[in-house]
Every structure is written in C-alpha cells, then in structure tokens.
Amino acid sequence: MNVDNNKGNIPELLWNGTISVRIDYEGNSLAYLANVPRQSYFAQILPNVQRLLAPSIPLSECWLDYNGVPLKWHWPVGLLFDLLTVFDPDTPRAPVLWRIQLRSGLFPTTKILQMETMDTFRTYFFNCLKESDYVRNGSSSGIIALSKAETDTYWNAILNHDYYDFRPIAIKILFSKSKFIPLKIYLGANAPIIQTSAPLGSSLGEFLNKRLPDLFPSCDKFLIVKPVIHGITIFLQSVLDELNRDFCYIDGFLHIVLMKV
C-alpha cells in the first residue's frame, strides 16, 4: 500500500532509514545494540537503555553522550547523527556503528533537558509540532483540531514506528494547507540554530542564497558548504515544496545540516 499515491516512496524510504548504534555504560560489560530509525528520538530508547545498563539509577539522572557532547533526547536521531558525526554523505565508507555512552551523575542541565518520563517526551514533541504548525499557517489550529483518536494514533505511530498510521495524519496536518515551510538550519554542533521559514515555490538554492549569501553565493552550485537532510546531500535546484513533502521530519520541520564541501 502506498499512502502517498503518485508521490513515490521517498518518504517511506526515509522513514525506514536506520543508524546502527552501540551504547555502553562504564563498569557494565553489557552493551545496548540497536538499529535506531533516523525518524525517531533517543527518548524512545533511553528507558530501555537505562533498565539494561543502569537499573539502579533513576531515568532522570541518565543521559546519552557522544565524544563528550550530551545528546538531546528531544532532537531527531538522524539530525544528531548528521550534525555530530559530520560523515560526508558523498564519501564512500564502510557501514558505521555509532558508539555512544550512557552517563549518570552530575547532570549537564545547562546543555540538555532531563527526561522524567515518556510523558515529558510527549509534551515536548507536541509543543514542537504546534510550533511548526504555527510557522506553516499562522496558528496551531491544525494540531489543536485533531481528534483525540487522531492524536493518539499519530503518537503511537511514532512510538511504534508505524509509517502507515503516521503518514495519513502527517499529510493532513503538515502538508495540506501550508503557507510557509518551517526550517531549522545547523551550521555546526556549537553554532546557534537558524530557525526560519521559506515561501512556497522557490528552490532551496534560491532560499539559501537570500538567507545565507556568504555561504551560498551561488543558487545552483556548492562552493563552501552543502545542505544535508536525512544523511543525503540535497541539490540546490530542489523545490522546497517537494522537500517539505518528502524530507520533512516528524516534528514538522525541515532540519538542514550544512557541511563543508
């Protein structure tokens, strides 16, 4: 079944993309191994990781760390991987096992949020969804208007990674009436996030040339940096409407990581 009709299978292919992850905890010989969907959150696996590797430590005192950088459990996994590992999508390489550490102790409250329960995650996620809806339409009415059954279906589809329950509601709330496209642009792990919106109808190159002319002096050629979404280098000629339809993350934003050419 193809819920996108003639739109092709790009959204489903991206939905099925995974990252191989190994999570270790100092002093424990066990390791947590999983293929984690790019279109998911570490919040979804953190409780299982904590129960396996550090059962005596409260969940709220645990966090994940990569090379000394605390991982934001409320950011999409694929975004974190692209931003922090900086693996060039266009460079041939062997499959990567992303090695992450589970940490506990003095919580880095200035860098990440504490996760108390899954309800913490749910609240944060729907706030992000309302935020992207507001950028699209000038209000969050699309999310607020969802029935309880639709809201629960959408949430459970994310938790269960069920594309066929997720996509019809996503089409309804994210793509059917958009006036603008919500974007977040990442210049590096330590750089401020550029949160902005783009009008419908323009190309990615045209938008980036206007928004970041020093980095994109050309509308159609990579000269300094290149945009990466879901681990894929995106051509500057790509139409933003199509990127929004096919490459949008589940929180309603187009998250674009800029990598050096």
Swiss-Prot record:
Cross-link (Glycyl lysine isopeptide (Lys-Gly) (interchain with G-Cter in ATG12)): 148
Domain of life of the native organism: Eukaryota
Keyword set, alphabetical order: Autophagy, Cytoplasm, Isopeptide bond, Meiosis, Membrane, Nucleus, Protein transport, Transport, Ubl conjugation
Keyword Membrane: yes
Pfam families in UniProt: ATG5_HBR, ATG5_UblA, ATG5_UblB
Membrane topology, from the record: Peripheral membrane protein
Effects seen without this gene: Impairs atg8-processing.
Modified how: Conjugated to atg12; which is essential for autophagy.
Residue ranges crossing the lipid bilayer per the database entry: none
Role: Involved in cytoplasm to vacuole transport (Cvt) and autophagic vesicle formation. Autophagy is essential for maintenance of amino acid levels and protein synthesis under nitrogen starvation. Required for selective autophagic degradation of the nucleus (nucleophagy). Also required for mitophagy, which eliminates defective or superfluous mitochondria in order to fulfill cellular energy requirements and prevent excess ROS production.
Subunit-structure text: Conjugated with atg12. Interacts with atg16 and atg18.
Name of the protein in its database record: Autophagy protein 5
UniProt organism field: Schizosaccharomyces pombe (strain 972 / ATCC 24843) (Fission yeast)
